[in-house]
Amino acid sequence: MAIPAPAAEALVERLFDATVDALELFSIHLGTRLGLYGALRDAGPLDAAGLAARAGIHERYAREWLEQQSVAGLLAVEDDLAAPAERRYSLPPEHAGVLAEPDDPDHVAPFATMLAGIGGVLPALAEAYRSGGGVPYARYGADFRHGQGGINRPAFRHDLPSVWLAAMPDVQARLDDASRPARVADVGCGHGWAAVAVAQAHPAARVDGIDLDRASIEDAREHAAAAGVADRVAFFEDDATGSAGRGPYDLVLVLEVLHDLARPVEALAAIRAALAPGGSVLIADERVADAFAAPGDSVERMMYGWSVLHCLPTQMAESSSAALGTVLRADTVRELAEAAGFGEPEVLPIENDLFRFYRLRA
């Protein structure tokens, strides 16, 4: 049956708007990577020559980028009737957190950097879809790695200690007990922001970060050193099962990781074995719908987007993978936990648009 004309027209309009949005996201990536937003935040308003000099880019490119950003409504221009070389642009204060402040709760510019990383592996993705193979995480490169670390950084540094752990008062009390320093593991630690945050918020605790990606571990060590907690935070290049040999742990963090594990039951069983008596596991994973339904809301659409372009391919790159994809529903978390020997997961009453939180007990 032919698609009714109005429906086709609506789809054309939707894809046109998506193309505009995609182009603007890639321009945001350039602004982030080249330090253009930071230059405007620190020294604006600037004309093209001023931005070029401060950021070390060519003046002609600076002018075009500034014009594009102002047309997109991301930057403000003092006088759009001025000659092109004389126009001065600024980063509005209300946009600075979104685009130029890595610790701001509204900082979502790293999404653009993640998409740039995906762009670099599209040919490999097409081949993986044909062959049934995968695309290893490292293949996505520094852009995706830094984007992923950056998008998680504000929540891990601020919400984790002040909101997420606060939902488990007994765990917070254990972390603050200086008479018996607590041990914490951050499984799939990535850039180490969660490990750093726990160490900063709880000076008596010692934290081990574990991740398979060597480049991420190197980044995490730099972040811990810069934060002044390297004496209490250690990072290890290992998979999730490596936690079993480094315990016992009073708390294990599995933040935005469970859906990415190739062998999640094996990993959770190792984590269970690594828990100290009375220990807990905090899982944060996607707040997707309880069951598949189409069309879905924006969160469901985003998670399926990450799944087809990143999460599933990285999982398929590992042997004997469960190939969960990104869309990890609550019933699946329950099944995985019970298969690993845990009891019923407790869903914590934490309000969050993207994550659902589960507590597992020893």
Predicted regions and their residues:
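Conserved Class I S-adenosyl-L-methionine-dependent methyltransferase catalytic core
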Residues: 14-31, 38-39, 63, 67-179
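Conserved adenosyl
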Residues: 119-259, 264-266
